Design a protein with these regions (language model features):
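Active-site-adjacent loop/helix surface patches within enzyme catalytic domains
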Residues: 156-200, 206-211
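Catalytic cores and adjacent binding grooves of peptidoglycan-active enzymes
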Residues: 50-65, 186-193, 198-274
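Long, intrinsically disordered low-complexity tandem-repeat segments
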Residues: 20-42
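Active-site acidic/histidine clusters and adjacent loop/turn architecture
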Residues: 109-174
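N-terminal module-boundary/linker segments of secreted carbohydrate-active enzymes
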Residues: 40-122
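Boundary at the C-terminal end of the N-terminal hydrophobic targeting segment
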Residues: 15-17
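Bacterial N-terminal signal peptides
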Residues: 3-12
Length: 274
């Protein structure tokens, strides 16, 4: 993880030394330093743990983790990045947001089996965004590691807030190009719980990576409908996921399967782990 942390710092423009200890899936420790190049060629390192060089408003956004908002790289200077890439049991305030939406009445998945994940991500405008997901605890560390790597490489993700912001409406979330994970729902047209119901599936940049099904008569179904132009995967466009894509490689490396590889239909946004 240290190599990823260094890359993150290069991406944000400041130095950061990170050491991790495997305490639990939610516990990590870190040390932050700022490096100054001196005129004699040597380097001077100083702790910046208490340094707060940017406007107070953004630090409040970061402290309260106001997902969906953007911050400057200066806001992260001296900030413990472990707090920006982490998973934890679902806080009460988050669980309240989920009630009657992604966590519906009759949900058979226990709160204790789920985790709230915080990550940073870049959008296509070069802005740092605060992201959030709810997932199954078995993939929480995978997601933290994947999104650390994607952030370090400045991989663009337009939006990442809980699907509850869209009333747990999958179509509305996809149309907003919102990356999401847990949502207790059934596979369309069935009474079979989707892998999203268990928090073991994630939809990444879904508007640009739609669900596509071609019938025997040649008729093509695309979801969401507003993503028709992105159903042709021979074209190049932003946020596109294919086998050369960094996100594809990172998810596959950790044992996830990709919906874009399915035979009867393709769900290009979709990664899941059994």
């Amino acid at each position: 993880m240290a190599a990823t942390a260094v890359a993150i710092c290069l991406a944000t423009g400041f130095a950061y030394a990170k050491q991790t200890t495997n305490l639990t899936d939610d516990a990590r420790q870190a040390t932050s330093v700022e490096t100054t190049n001196l005129t004699d060629g040597s380097q001077q390192k100083a702790s910046v743990t208490e340094k707060d060089p940017r406007p107070g408003g953004e630090r409040t956004v970061l402290k309260n983790w106001e997902a969906g908002k953007t911050i400057s790289s200066l806001t992260l200077r001296g900030y413990d990045l472990n707090k920006c890439f982490m998973s934890e049991p679902i806080p009460n305030r988050v669980f309240e947001r989920m009630q009657g939406k992604s966590y519906k009445k009759g949900c058979t998945v226990s709160r204790e089996s789920l985790r709230y994940v915080k990550v940073l991500h870049w959008n296509d405008k070069g802005k740092i965004c605060l992201g959030e997901l709810v997932c199954h605890k078995s993939i929480a560390n995978d997601l933290v590691e994947i999104f650390e790597t994607l952030f370090a490489k400045k991989y663009p993700i337009e939006r990442m807030v809980l699907i509850d912001n869209y009333g747990a409406d999958d179509l509305k979330s996809m149309e907003a190009n919102n990356t999401s994970c847990f949502n207790f729902r059934y596979v369309a047209g069935t009474k079979v719980p989707s892998n999203h119901s268990y928090g073991k599936a994630i939809d990444l940049n879904p508007l640009y990576n739609p669900y596509v099904r071609k019938a025997a008569n040649g008729k093509k179904t695309v979801s969401p409908l507003s993503a028709q132009r992105y159903a042709d995967r021979s074209k190049d466009f932003k946020y596109k996921i294919d086998r050369n894509d960094l996100a594809y490689k990172e998810f596959r490396k950790r044992g996830f399967t990709w919906g874009g590889s399915w035979k009867r239909s393709q769900d290009y946004q979709h990664f899941e782990k059994k």
